Design a protein with these regions (language model features):
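Outer-membrane beta-barrel signature, preferentially recognizing the C-terminal barrel domain
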Residues: 132, 162, 265-275
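Flexible, surface-exposed loop regions and adjacent strand-edge segments
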Residues: 63, 127-131, 191, 248-254, ...
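Long, well-ordered mid-to-C-terminal structural blocks that present hydrophobic/aromatic surfaces
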Residues: 213-251
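Beta-barrel outer-membrane channel/assembly domains of diderm bacteria
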Residues: 8-9, 17, 21-118, 122-125, ...
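Flexible, solvent-exposed coil segments and beta strand-coil junctions
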Residues: 116-123, 172-175, 252-262
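Solvent-exposed loop segments that connect transmembrane elements
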Residues: 243-266, 299-302
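Solvent-exposed, low-complexity segments and loops of surface/extracellular structural proteins
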Residues: 8, 155-157, 179-181
Length: 342
């Protein structure tokens, strides 16, 4: 009788222990699941697709589409590109991937691959129109100190052989931006100064830059808001320095390195200068801009004329249609673009 009671008690105790273990495991699973669901629910994602159609030769068009998916979650940012060409080929690539964290309230530390842009974009800038990506792998520490925004970091991973510091601020209508880069002891810099007056209707700008290879750039500009939707602008840009005449300004991390394919005027060479002037008209859903460039040699007679015409139409909240045309002397280049965002 004692053995039966002892066996029964052991069986009951074992059953209760197993039941408690199962309940504990189930609770842990539920907690983890709830945390995962909460994390996913709090994540923000977006998607966009841009199509470029080269319409220069209407009998032989070509083009490609880039689709980008972006995910932001708890300080983590991941963005990837998928490319589809009209010839049927496809490819994929990582656009951005970084993690950001607050540093005891002093600033923000970011590690990973980023698409950076500083000041006027002479040395470091993103592509706002074209398909090229200008990303760097490294770390960035940003902070604000008495109205001055400071970024300092590396562009060659976590090693310090390629590093930069950028400072920017705005005071009483005056804006400044100073960027200095040290690329394995090759030191480049760019300084931007802007002044706004007449309640922001008249804006003056001045930029000085050195690519670290003895080619220097100077640009002066003015922009004026004729009325709410119409503005006119003009710039004079000159390249000079101790480098050999014909040496192109070196800025591989700037969209100006590719120029027209990224929708901007490209960097020129030592001994060249450009006069640019144009207008832009924005009605909200419809936007139009037209700019003329004249490129000449400082000590020569050679001249090249560029014209840049851009037209865009906001079809709906998610889709924008665009048309862009360049004319270089007597040669025309035209593109049709379609942008979709979610």
């Amino acid at each position: 009788g004692h053995e039966i009671r002892y066996t029964y008690i052991c069986h009951v105790l074992t059953k209760n222990i197993n039941l408690k273990i199962m309940k504990k495991n189930l609770r842990n699973v539920l907690v983890l699941s709830l945390g995962l669901i909460t994390t996913i629910a709090s994540a923000q994602w977006s998607a966009s697709s841009n199509t470029w159609i080269d319409n220069t030769n209407s009998d032989d068009r070509s083009g490609f589409t880039r689709s980008t998916v972006t995910l932001d979650m708890s300080g983590v940012h991941i963005s990837g590109d998928h490319y589809w060409n009209t010839d049927g080929t496809t490819s994929q690539g990582l656009y951005e991937a970084y993690v950001s964290s607050d540093v005891m309230g002093f600033g923000t530390l970011t590690l990973g691959r980023q698409d950076l842009s500083f000041g006027s974009g002479v040395l470091v800038s993103s592509s706002n129109w074209g398909a090229n990506r200008y990303t760097t792998d490294g770390m960035d520490f940003s902070m604000s100190l008495s109205g001055i925004n400071i970024n300092a970091g590396t562009m060659g991973g976590i090693n310090t052989d390629v590093n930069y510091i950028n400072a920017s601020g705005e005071f009483a209508g005056v804006s400044i931006n100073a960027l200095m880069i040290d690329n394995q002891d090759v030191k480049s810099n760019a300084y931007d100064l802007g002044y706004s007056m007449m309640n922001g209707d008249l804006n003056l700008s001045y930029t000085m830059a050195d690519d670290g290879y003895d080619t220097e750039m100077t640009r002066m500009g003015v922009a004026y808001n004729v009325f709410e939707n119409l503005s006119v602008h003009g710039h004079m840009t000159q390249y000079e320095g101790e480098s050999a005449v014909g040496t192109v300004f070196n800025a591989p991390m700037s969209s100006m390195s590719e120029g027209l394919s990224d929708g901007v005027m490209p960097h020129l060479a030592n001994g060249q200068e450009a006069m640019s002037y144009g207008l832009s008209y924005d009605l909200g859903d419809i936007a139009f801009s037209y700019t003329m460039h004249n490129v000449s040699e400082t000590d020569g007679d050679a001249e090249v004329d560029y014209t840049d015409l851009s037209l865009s139409y906001q079809l709906n909240d998610n889709c924008t249609l665009g048309y862009r045309s360049w004319k270089i002397d007597d040669t025309d280049y035209t593109f049709i673009t379609v942008g979709i965002g979610l």
